[in-house]
């Protein structure tokens, strides 16, 4: 019996190793195809969904799901750098998430502070001259979180490499409201009346006051977890974005899933409403 169990374990190890080797080979093939095609998003949007469900499926505390999700964000940043994607926005925390249980929200904000401090000294950020910006409404964040985000932004402010936007306290409708308010304040500072401000209002005028106005609109947006909805992510900018919905939870998002999504994007014909 012992020898039979040993043989079964050996066979299982062989099957696992074989599957791993096949997946690795497939991943390398995908990477070559994506690189050879050369058509990559100028601005990639990532909706990081499924942290809590990942933890629940694995029998873990939900806080662990957020921790694994933070680790995955570091991996995906590396994949973007390897491919030379110019700009990426990752949606970490929505305005609606602010209504979650205090203990969970405190854990997420603590993670955000930790990750911001780590990114500020991450050799990859400085070697690749990645400019990092936190976008969203942060007025209600704890002072130590705000300090960490401000330090990260200041330490990369002069860089002209990849642009990385971390959307925290972010909502698409709130962004549009903020943009309109900013536009009106600018018009008032220039001495315009309300009637003149209304006459001057155009889509481009609002676009100039969005959080990432100096970057191209996202041309490709990936959402994990199998949920097929937009949830207000970059509402104004995503009018012509291509979407890809991936069935895996964010912490389980693999490089092969990332490459499959990009290959799908490369096969699409973007018509921009025409």
UniProtKB/Swiss-Prot annotation:
GO terms for molecular function: magnesium ion binding; prenyltransferase activity. Mg(2+) binds at residues 49, 242. Its cofactor is Mg(2+). Substrate binds at residues 50-54, 62, 66, 94-96, 100, 223, 229-231. The gene is uppS. This is Isoprenyl transferase. PROSITE patterns: UPP_SYNTHASE. Homodimer. CDD domains: Cis_IPPS. Pfam families: Prenyltransf. The keyword Transferase applies. Disulfide bonds: none annotated. The active site is at 49, 97 (proton acceptor). Belongs to the UPP synthase family. Catalyzes the condensation of isopentenyl diphosphate (IPP) with allylic pyrophosphates generating different type of terpenoids. The keyword Aminoacyl-tRNA synthetase does not apply. InterPro entries: UPP_synth-like, UPP_synth-like_CS, UPP_synth-like_sf.
């Amino acid at each position: 019996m012992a020898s039979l169990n040993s043989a079964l374990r050996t066979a299982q190890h062989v099957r696992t190793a074989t599957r791993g080797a096949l997946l690795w080979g497939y991943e390398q093939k995908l990477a070559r195809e994506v690189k050879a095609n050369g058509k990559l998003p100028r601005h990639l949007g990532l909706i990081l969904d499924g942290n809590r469900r990942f933890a629940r499926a694995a029998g873990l505390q939900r806080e662990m799901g957020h921790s694994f999700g933070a680790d995955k964000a570091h991996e995906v940043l590396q994949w973007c750098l390897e491919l030379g994607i110019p700009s990426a926005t990752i949606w970490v925390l929505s305005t609606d998430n602010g209504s979650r249980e205090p203990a969970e929200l405190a854990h997420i904000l603590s993670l955000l502070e930790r990750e911001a401090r780590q990114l500020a000294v991450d050799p990859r950020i400085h070697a690749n001259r990645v400019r990092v910006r936190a976008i969203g409404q942060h007025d209600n964040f704890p002072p130590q979180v705000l300090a960490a985000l401000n330090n990260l932004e200041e330490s990369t402010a002069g860089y002209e490499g990849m642009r990385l936007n971390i959307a925290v306290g972010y909502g698409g409708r709130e962004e549009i409201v903020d943009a309109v308010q900013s536009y009106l304040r600018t018009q008032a500072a220039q001495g315009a009346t309300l009637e003149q401000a209304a006459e001057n209002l155009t889509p481009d005028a609002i676009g100039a006051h969005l959080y990432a106005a100096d970057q191209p609109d996202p041309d490709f947006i990936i959402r994990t977890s199998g949920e097929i909805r937009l949830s207000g992510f970059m509402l104004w900018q995503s009018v012509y974005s291509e979407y890809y919905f991936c069935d895996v939870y964010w912490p389980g998002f693999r490089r092969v899933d990332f490459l499959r999504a990009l290959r799908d994007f490369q096969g699409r014909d973007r018509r921009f409403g025409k």
